[in-house]
């Protein structure tokens, strides 16, 4: 039997049930476990309560229960510089960013990993639903979590081989329901705590209200692609491609009673384009360009391959052909795709393995850009 007592694992503990069970399982497996709470955002809720303080209390309670030391580390500056500035720049450019992908790459598996090394860590661990598997050459492959509904490899797709070599995902083989059961059986303080939602480390604030604190909204015209004026929009940054709600126009404007959707943006003229029908022609595309292309292991500078891909979290995989040229790629779809959104991640899979991915720059229909951006 392996003696894990000399292997130190530093666990990123958020105060939620997933990271609590992560620490518990590692402790039960005999590892030398240390818990670390990351404070990445200066946050208070509508009642003036600092939610980070409440979460840290939960971390302390769980760490005391399972008998591990714990620390708090402040990454507010790193988060602002490496994640939040990027987040704002993307919205200024009319795109819809995915800050969770950048947060994992820059904070949880860079700033936190570096800090863990100063504590003498051999590995870091988090409560993500993903799996790592070593091959005979010592290379680490990242596999989807066993719970399809919770798999988080989409958000981990920018991690490097070096980061994965130092990472453990103890929940990867479990269903979420099993994680709750483990927490309840152990009587953990977080066993019944609800899952957090919302933007990475910003929580459940009203998004429109939150964004307006940092970016001035500029109202403009809402139009159909054939030039019909449909009224005023509140600011392009508040809308994403394929969005249905919040437009303030109903079926009465159309004649066929189909709902209205955002189909494009023109940043230079501050126009929001809308169209009727879930599969409106302006929402459909057959390829995309992506940048910041990254693979979890070494790949050639230029190559072409077939795989499946996700263009947003929680969507079925689609078959694609990928033409890689350095850190850029053209991704050609086997079937037309709906609402491909600049700023979101495209993530590549080979069966259960997550190969990596990139950030969507533009969608194309028959070679023509189709987002009006």
Swiss-Prot record:
Q: Does the keyword Membrane apply?
A: no
Which Gene3D superfamilies does the record cross-reference, listed alphabetically? Adenine nucleotide alpha hydrolases-like domains, HUPs, Translation factors
Q: Which reaction does it catalyse?
A: S-sulfanyl-L-cysteinyl-[protein] + uridine(34) in tRNA + AH2 + ATP = 2-thiouridine(34) in tRNA + L-cysteinyl-[protein] + A + AMP + diphosphate + H(+)
Assigned keywords, A-Z: ATP-binding, Cytoplasm, Disulfide bond, Nucleotide-binding, RNA-binding, Transferase, tRNA processing, tRNA-binding
Q: Where is this region: Interaction with tRNA?
A: 150-152, 312-313
EC number(s) given by UniProt = 2.8.1.13
Family (UniProt): Belongs to the MnmA/TRMU family.
Which protein are we looking at?
A: tRNA-specific 2-thiouridylase MnmA
């Amino acid at each position: 039997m392996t003696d894990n007592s000399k292997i130190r694992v530093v666990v990123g503990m958020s105060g939620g049930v997933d990271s609590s069970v992560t620490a518990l399982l590692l402790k039960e497996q005999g590892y030398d476990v240390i818990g670390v709470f990351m404070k990445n955002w200066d946050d208070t809720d509508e009642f003036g309560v600092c939610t980070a303080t409440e979460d840290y209390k939960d971390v302390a309670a769980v760490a005391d229960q399972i008998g591990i030391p714990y620390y708090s580390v402040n990454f507010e500056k790193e988060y602002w510089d490496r994640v939040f500035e990027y987040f704002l720049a993307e919205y200024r450019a009319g795109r819809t960013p995915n800050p969770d992908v950048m947060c994992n790459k820059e904070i949880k598996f860079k700033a936190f990993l570096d800090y863990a090394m100063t504590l003498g860590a051999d590995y870091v661990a988090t409560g993500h639903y993903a799996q790592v598997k070593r091959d005979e050459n010592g290379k680490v492959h990242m596999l989807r979590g066993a719970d399809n509904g919770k798999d988080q490899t989409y958000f981990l797709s920018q991690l490097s081989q070096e980061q994965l070599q130092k990472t453990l995902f103890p929940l990867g083989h479990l269903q979420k329901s099993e994680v709750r059961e483990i927490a309840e059986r152990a009587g953990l303080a977080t066993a019944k705590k609800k899952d957090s939602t919302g933007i990475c480390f910003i929580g459940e604030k009203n998004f429109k209200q939150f964004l307006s604190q940092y970016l001035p909204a500029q109202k403009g015209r809402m139009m159909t692609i054939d030039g019909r004026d449909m009224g005023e929009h509140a600011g392009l940054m508040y809308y994403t491609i394929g969005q249905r709600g919040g437009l303030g126009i109903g079926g009465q404007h159309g004649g066929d009673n189909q709902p209205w959707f955002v189909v494009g943006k023109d940043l230079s003229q501050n126009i929001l384009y809308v169209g009727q029908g879930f599969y409106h022609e302006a929402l459909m595309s057959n390829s995309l360009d992506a940048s910041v292309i990254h693979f979890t292991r070494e790949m050639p500078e230029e190559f072409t391959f077939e795989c499946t891909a996700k263009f947003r979290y929680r969507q079925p995989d689609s078959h694609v052909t990928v033409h890689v040229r350095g850190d850029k790629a053209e991704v050609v779809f086997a079937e037309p795709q709906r609402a491909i959104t600049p700023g979101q991640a495209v993530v590549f899979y080979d069966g259960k393995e997550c190969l990596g991915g990139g950030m969507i720059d533009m969608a194309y229909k028959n070679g023509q850009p189709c987002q009006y951006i």
